[in-house]
Design a protein with these regions (language model features):
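Terminal targeting signals and extreme-terminal segments of soluble enzymes
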Residues: 1-175
């Protein structure tokens, strides 16, 4: 993608048939512990934030992680919550790609400025086709340095299986 003559987006994709994936498994993590979706804070677009596309998904933030919206950053660079398509439409691999980039930046809870956090690189791994129902998501940051931060994401399906992972490198928001 170009803006005038300047490249602003490059995409590389590798695709395969997940139904043919087989092999040993070792899972050292677990789905995030979340209150029910009804007890979480629904993200609804208004103005420029959250962005208008959020009206096309159902995203619910853990109450502890949603407090940034009222000026109470937790100090922990963490975002957890539920994700699904509208009207409980079944999620597919494209929905998983949307889920890994739909949550607010973890920087919003890190006592950094709440501002544009531009993505430099986003890598997403689709590990399995998700079971029907809500997806549990967790995004965390361990390192903020030299003007960059990384955000690692996990997406778990209603059967408790890891179905997606992501790593996003972003610029630290400037206030």
């Amino acid at each position: 993608m170009f803006s005038d003559t300047r490249p602003v987006l490059a995409v590389l994709g590798t695709v395969g048939d997940l139904s043919q994936a087989a092999g040993p498994e070792l899972i050292e993590g677990a789905p995030p512990d979340l209150p029910s979706p009804e007890e979480c804070v629904r993200v609804v677009p208004s103005g420029t934030f959250p962005p208008p596309f959020m009206g096309h998904v159902d995203l619910r933030l853990h109450p502890d992680d949603a407090a940034f919206a009222t000026g109470r950053q937790s100090g922990k660079p963490l975002m957890r919550g539920w994700f699904r398509l509208p009207e409980d439409e079944p999620a597919d691999s494209l929905a998983l790609l949307c889920a890994v980039d739909a949550f607010p930046p973890t920087a919003f809870n890190a006592r950094l400025p709440i501002a544009w956090t531009p993505t430099v690189e986003l890598t997403a791994h689709i590990r399995a086709n998700p079971a029907p129902g809500w997806l549990r998501c967790r995004f965390s940051t361990r390192f903020v340095s030299s003007g960059f931060l990384e955000e690692d994401g996990e997406v778990w399906d209603s059967a408790g299986r890891l179905v997606g992972q992501s790593r996003q490198l972003a610029l630290v928001p400037q206030g």
